[in-house]
Amino acid sequence: MGRVVIWVTIIIVLFPVLWIVMSSFSAGDSFFLSSLFPKKFSIEHYTSLFQETNFMLWTWNSVKLCLIVAAIQLAMTSLAAYAFSRLRFTGRKYGLMSLLVLQVFPSSMAVAGYYILIYEFGLVDSNAALIFVLAGGSAYNIWLLKSYIDGLPKELDEAAMVDGATHFQVFRKIILPLAAPQLAVIFLFSFIATYSEYVITSIFLQ
């Protein structure tokens, strides 16, 4: 019974995707036909897409921006998560609570403030401004990675420090390799979130 439910769920999820894919190969006047498989296969939509638009350039610009934002977020997230997990400093508790509280408010609430700041610096309609805005939203990822680092044995850190390693060396040579799976997940989350962002992108890139 469990497998039946799984297969039914898979079919329900994949059917719209299959419909869109098959519709893309239909002639221009047969998109809304009730049949799943078009009566006449055509690649005219793809021909029009690649020959009449700058689709590849648009895609490359989006991917490039997403890679840059994801890399910046990963660097900031990993450093912050290590600091909150392994170091004890003044304001640590309040910093963690602030990150948690920030998750309550949608990022759209800060758009007006961001725009005023970007406008004052004369960076409106620039990739630098968009990267600055999108790379900052990593509070959830910091909590996610901190929880993962908390589960790593502290004895490894202590053994390395006994041998003379600094905190940064412990972070780079021990924590990062052990946290590689979680780092990959965070990079993927950041990439997808940036690629899916429309409102902020449309505001800062006019």
Where are these regions (language model features)?
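A structural signal for multi-pass alpha-helical bundles of membrane permease subunits
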Residues: 2-206
